[in-house]
């Protein structure tokens, strides 16, 4: 005896193909709260779970070699609300929870400003030999797939 459940199979007829619904997105990653201020963490930055605010503060402090002073007793409470009140204690807290000074890259902005080297530009120029080879490949493709070339908008030199 067959069970009450029926098994449906997908038809191979192109008329009956229905696009499948998009796959559900994976659940968002949940990180431990920021080790520095307990705000919502955006991931592991410089070795610890950290929020965007503490990540940026630590990076800027290290890249600019900042030296801060505490106007109290060097034991200020650092949390989501108070984290911007004392930069000295916030940076100390970053180090206490394990943020790594060595993980901060100092060369990211420098790379953007470097001029493109002349030898790189020259290597991008197409030689006559490569130009000829490209044209031969294009023509061979056109002869092999003439119906595609009639579409016009999908080819560059039709």
From Swiss-Prot:
Keyword Cytoplasm: no
DNA-binding region boundaries: 31-106
GO molecular function, one term: nuclear receptor activity
KW DNA-binding (keyword) present: yes
Pfam families, sorted: zf-C4
InterPro entries reported for this sequence: NR_DBD_RAR, Nucl_hrmn_rcpt_lig-bd, Retinoic_acid_rcpt, Znf_hrmn_rcpt, Znf_NHR/GATA
Keywords in alphabetical order: DNA-binding, Metal-binding, Nucleus, Receptor, Transcription, Transcription regulation, Zinc, Zinc-finger
Any one Gene Ontology cellular component term annotated for this protein: transcription regulator complex
Region described as Disordered: spans on this chain: 1-24
GO biological process terms, semicolon-separated: cellular response to corticotropin-releasing hormone stimulus; retinoic acid receptor signaling pathway
Domain NR LBD: 129-158
Secretion signal span: none
Cell location: Nucleus
Top-level taxon: Eukaryota
Residue stretches of biased makeup (Low complexity): 1-18
Positions annotated as zinc finger (NR C4-type): 34-54, 70-94
Coarse class of the protein's main subcellular location: nucleus
CDD domains to which the protein is assigned, alphabetical: NR_DBD_RAR
Record's function text: Receptor for retinoic acid. Retinoic acid receptors bind as heterodimers to their target response elements in response to their ligands, all-trans or 9-cis retinoic acid, and regulate gene expression in various biological processes. The RAR/RXR heterodimers bind to the retinoic acid response elements (RARE) composed of tandem 5'-AGGTCA-3' sites known as DR1-DR5.
Subunit structure and binding partners: Heterodimer; with a RXR molecule. Binds DNA preferentially as a RAR/RXR heterodimer.
Family to which the UniProt record says this protein belongs: Belongs to the nuclear hormone receptor family. NR1 subfamily.
This protein's domain notes: Composed of three domains: a modulating N-terminal domain, a DNA-binding domain and a C-terminal ligand-binding domain.
Full protein name: Retinoic acid receptor beta
Gene of this entry: RARB
